[in-house]
């Protein structure tokens, strides 16, 4: 316990030292000076730089300045000498008046230290003012019968100085009848009195002249004098007498101040000053003395202020008349005040019952008030009224008391507040009135349900909206107030496509803002029907409903889908055939596409995006029909490649492209002959490449051997050279030249090509396939031919096939078939319309161009006819489809047909997931023949 006690004592000692230091610093920071008054400007008060422990030059460096409190600055700093000097003349009497000490306090700020120093300057008094009387002469009248010892007050002298410099004494000039008596008051003031020492005799001397001198105690001594004229009065033996003993007068209360009422006259038989009469009020109270005034010379009585009959209607007073000898006479004055209508009625509210419920019954008391008038007679009779067309009425319940009642049932929704003006009017002439204004609040009850601004709402929202998007804001207005008008919004429970409505949309219960909780898809559903309910917070709550229908607007969010031609399932590329004898406008094929959007977003247009032979083919703008633009020539290549672009009319437009391969030949043998001619240049090119590689390898080998021999001759031994050559020849012996020749680690890849075409036994048309080039040693391999085979040909069964491994061909996709109604017919005679409107039924007039892929089974058994059976893959006279569109979604209702209000309908049956009855039972394998 000893250690904590010592710590506490040490802490208290430190605190005490800190307090003493602060007191010492505060005392040290207070600087005191003194300066006499009336000094000239620039008078040095003190060396402030020394007292602040600063050099004179530091006053400017440290930005030392005087901080005043808005008063006129009496002192200033001299930055050169570091002294505090006067800024002008200082008058102590003007500054501090009669204060014993005159102190001037201000602060000096040292800005760099941010420290203030208190400065106290005492302004000392100098004897710069002499005692002064208010008048230079004074007349004193004394009756000759006055007895010795009588005292008469004399005027005082005023000296603004203080201390010894102030007034110290009075002196009276020498005489035989009077002496001077000086009295000192409680406040230290010196009051002189004139004392009669000897009786006066008017016959001996009618007047006496005296001089009173007032002196201060300063250096030099200052004084002033006043002359006193003493007049000896004669004896007075007649008193003043009034003409009437009682004066009566009547006056209206509204006469202005200064109105003459009467004149009371008194006479004195004496002569001279003894016969001169002076008038004054004698017996009068203080209130009356403020209302009336009396001329002391003439005796005229007039009003000094406005009279008030209601305050006092009768006044009684006495008037005294005194002559110069001191004799007096008296009379009585009676003043009657007559009433005029100068007071407005006064209305005093006794009870106010506000607010009032809007369902208050008729006759409910709202206000009880008193109305009275201070006037008398008819001037004091009051009549009260209120403005018309209000739901209230006035009743006079008792004398001067009125009640304000409800005249009918109130409706807060029509008027929530009433400003009632009660007018009180007297019956005077002219009548005076007073108005009071009352604000009556009507309390609401929950008698109104929320009401929507519309009977129903239709809202439009573009599809693909972001989640949480604000859709719409419904507003219901409740004419009630406060909680009765606070509306809470909600959605009625409902189910849409098996899911609760709350999974699609939500509503803010406070604001009525409808939000989307998911991204809507026009293709999924196009409108939502919901009920929005608005309930107030009253007791009991009231509610109302409104129907809201949300329409989902289609956006161009789906690109066109190419239905035909489609990529075969076996990975090959379909080929369309066109005879060399085709005339301009010959229908080669037709591109069929659909768009999942609707309206203009699904309106498709076709154009030829790219072609290997410009000007040879054209595409119908709205039909997608690929036709020959000119007659085919012998110089036209066998294989023509076309890229057709399909674009919708949405904003922004979306598009898709499809690549078509057209083989130009009149018959199937022509195709085979053309294929044979195409293989010869390929073999020549391969042989030329092999020759170049052999020559390059030989040259490089010679250079390498020469270099090795030279090195061996110079630096290596003969046996090491022989061993190195043997090892080198052994390493090169096992590399087949048909694959690659290595030159300094670089491999030259041999390119192999594969070609495949499919034929049917009953048709002159063929399916020609040109796969991608196959590279021997790359990571990417083609599935249509093996790596070591330079050419793969798939031929019909009536051609000889070598003993090579057979690769099974994928069967045609049985899901991609057209019904008989959808199967396109012969259309070579039709002409495409590039600028016209769409056909009336796009799916009924050659919508689809089927890929021509021969069926091996039909070619083998020869069961197919030229026209092709319903259950076979045979070809028509022109072309036939090899797949149906049963698995493709029916978007024809989305297709917009310009110039027509019709929509496309599906005539085909729905997909049943089963293969056709005949024609696809046998699968055919294509043989591959190696070309060297």
Curated annotation (Swiss-Prot):
Residues 922-932 have a biased composition (Basic residues). The chain crosses the membrane at residues 693-713. Gene3D superfamilies: Cadherins. Keywords: Calcium, Cell adhesion, Cell membrane, Glycoprotein, Membrane, Repeat, Signal, Transmembrane, Transmembrane helix. It is a single-pass type I membrane protein. Residues 816-841 have a biased composition (Polar residues). Residues 803-841, 902-932 are annotated as: Disordered. It comes from the Eukaryota. It is found in: Cell membrane. GO terms for molecular function: calcium ion binding. Residues 29-133, 134-242, 243-347, 348-452, 453-562, 570-683 form the Cadherin domain. Residues 1-28 form the signal peptide. GO terms for biological process: homophilic cell adhesion via plasma membrane adhesion molecules; nervous system development. Glycans are attached at residues 47, 127, 389, 419, 545. Residues 29-692 are extracellular. InterPro entries: Cadherin-like_dom, Cadherin-like_sf, Cadherin_C, Cadherin_CBD, Cadherin_CS, Cadherin_N, Protocadherin/Cadherin-CA. Pfam families: Cadherin, Cadherin_2, Cadherin_C_2, Cadherin_tail. Its main location: membrane. Residues 714-932 are cytoplasmic. GO terms for cellular component: plasma membrane. Potential calcium-dependent cell-adhesion protein. May be involved in the establishment and maintenance of specific neuronal connections in the brain. This is Protocadherin gamma-A9. It comes from Pan troglodytes (Chimpanzee). The lineage of its organism: Eukaryota, Metazoa, Chordata, Craniata, Vertebrata. The gene is PCDHGA9.
């Amino acid at each position: 316990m000893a250690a904590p006690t010592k710590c506490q004592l040490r802490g208290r000692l430190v605190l005490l030292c800190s307090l003493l230091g602060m007191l010492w610093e505060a005392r040290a920071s207070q600087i005191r000076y003194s300066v006499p008054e009336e000094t000239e400007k620039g008078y040095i008060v003190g060396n402030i730089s020394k007292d602040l422990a600063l050099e004179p030059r530091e006053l400017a460096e440290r930005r030392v300045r005087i901080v005043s409190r808005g008063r006129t600055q009496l002192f200033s700093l001299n930055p050169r000498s570091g002294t505090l000097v006067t800024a002008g003349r200082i008058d102590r009497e003007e500054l501090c008046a009669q204060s014993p000490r005159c102190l001037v306090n201000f602060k000096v700020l040292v800005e760099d230290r941010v420290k203030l120093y208190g400065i106290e300057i005492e302004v000392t008094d100098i004897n710069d003012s002499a005692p002064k009387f208010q008048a230079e002469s004074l007349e004193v009248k004394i009756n000759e019968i006055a007895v010795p010892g009588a005292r008469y007050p004399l005027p005082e002298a005023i000296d603004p100085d203080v201390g010894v410099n102030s007034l110290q004494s009075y002196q009276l000039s020498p005489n035989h009848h009077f002496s001077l008596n000086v009295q000192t008051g409680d406040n230290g003031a010196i009051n002189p009195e004139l004392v009669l020492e000897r009786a006066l005799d008017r016959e001996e001397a009618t007047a006496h002249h005296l001089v009173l001198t007032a002196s201060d105690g300063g250096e030099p001594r200052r004084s002033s004098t006043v002359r006193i004229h003493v007049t000896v009065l004669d004896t007075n033996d007649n008193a003043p007498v009034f003409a009437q003993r009682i004066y009566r007068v009547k006056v209206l209360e509204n006469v202005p101040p200064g109105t003459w009422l009467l004149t009371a006259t008194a006479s004195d038989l004496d002569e001279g000053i003894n016969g001169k009469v002076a008038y004054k009020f004698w017996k009068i109270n203080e209130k009356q003395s403020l209302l009336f005034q009396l001329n002391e010379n003439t005796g005229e009585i007039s009003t000094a202020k406005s009279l008030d009959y209601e305050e006092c209607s009768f006044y009684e007073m006495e008037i005294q008349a005194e002559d110069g000898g001191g004799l007096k006479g008296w009379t009585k004055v009676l003043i009657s005040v007559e009433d005029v209508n100068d007071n407005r009625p006064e209305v005093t509210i006794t009870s106010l019952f506000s607010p009032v419920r809007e369902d208050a019954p008729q006759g409910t008391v709202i206000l009880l008030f008193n109305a009275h008038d201070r006037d008398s007679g008819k001037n004091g009779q009051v009549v009260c009224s209120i403005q018309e067309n209000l739901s209230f009425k006035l009743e006079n319940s008792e004398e001067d008391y009125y009640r304000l009642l409800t005249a009918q049932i109130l409706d807060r929704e029509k008027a929530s507040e009433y400003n009632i003006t009660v007018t009180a009017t007297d019956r005077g002439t002219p009548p005076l009135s007073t108005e009071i204004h009352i604000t009556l609040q009507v309390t609401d009850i929950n008698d109104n349900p929320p009401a929507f601004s519309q009977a129903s709402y239709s809202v439009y929202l573009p599809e693909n909206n972001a989640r949480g998007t604000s859709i719409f804001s419904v507003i219901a207005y409740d004419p009630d107030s406060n909680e009765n008008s606070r509306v809470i919004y909600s959605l009625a429970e409902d189910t849409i496509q098996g899911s609760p409505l709350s999974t699609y949309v939500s509503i803010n219960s406070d604001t009525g803002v409808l939000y989307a909780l998911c991204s809507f898809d026009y293709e999924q559903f196009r409108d939502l029907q919901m009920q929005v309910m608005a309930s107030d917070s009253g007791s009991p709550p009231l509610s109302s409903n409104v129907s809201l229908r949300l329409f989902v607007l289609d956006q161009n969010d789906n690109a066109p889908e190419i239905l035909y031609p489609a990529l075969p399932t076996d990975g090959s590329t379909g080929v369309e055939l066109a005879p060399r004898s085709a005339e301009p406008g010959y229908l080669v094929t037709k591109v069929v596409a659909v768009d999942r959007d609707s309206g203009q977003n699904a309106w498709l247009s076709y154009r030829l995006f790219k072609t290997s032979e410009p000007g040879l083919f054209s595409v119908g703008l709205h039909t997608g029909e690929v036709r020959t633009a000119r007659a085919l020539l012998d110089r036209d290549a066998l294989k023509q490649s076309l890229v057709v672009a399909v674009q919708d009319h949405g904003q922004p437009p979306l598009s898709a492209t499809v690549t078509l391969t057209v083989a130009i030949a009149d018959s199937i043998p022509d195709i085979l002959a053309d294929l044979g001619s195409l293989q010869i240049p390929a073999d020549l090119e391969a042989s030329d490449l092999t020759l170049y590689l052999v020559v390059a390898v030989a040259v490089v080998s010679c250079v390498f051997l020469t270099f090795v021999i030279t090195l061996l001759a110079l630096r290596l031994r003969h046996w090491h050279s022989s061993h190195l050559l043997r090892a080198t020849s052994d390493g090169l012996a096992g590399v087949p030249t048909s694959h690659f020749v290595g030159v300094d680690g670089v491999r030259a890849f041999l390119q192999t090509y594969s070609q495949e075409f499919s034929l049917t036994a009953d048709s002159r048309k063929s399916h020609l396939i040109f796969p991608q080039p196959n590279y021997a040693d790359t990571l990417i391999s083609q599935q249509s031919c093996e790596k070591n085979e330079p050419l793969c040909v798939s031929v019909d069964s009536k051609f000889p096939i070598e003993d090579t491994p057979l690769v099974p061909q994928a069967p045609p996709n049985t899901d991609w078939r057209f019904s008989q109604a959808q199967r396109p017919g012969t259309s070579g005679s039709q002409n495409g319309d590039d600028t016209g409107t769409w056909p009336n039924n796009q799916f009924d007039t050659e919508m689809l161009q089927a890929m021509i892929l021969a069926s091996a089974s039909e070619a083998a058994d020869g069961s197919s006819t030229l026209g092709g059976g319903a259950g076979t893959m045979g070809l028509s006279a022109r072309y036939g489809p090899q797949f149906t569109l049963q698995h493709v979604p029916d978007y024809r209702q989305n297709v917009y047909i310009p110039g027509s209000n019709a929509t496309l309908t599906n005539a085909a049956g729905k997909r049943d997931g089963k293969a056709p009855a005949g024609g696809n039972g046998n699968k055919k394998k294509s043989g591959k023949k190696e070309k060297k």
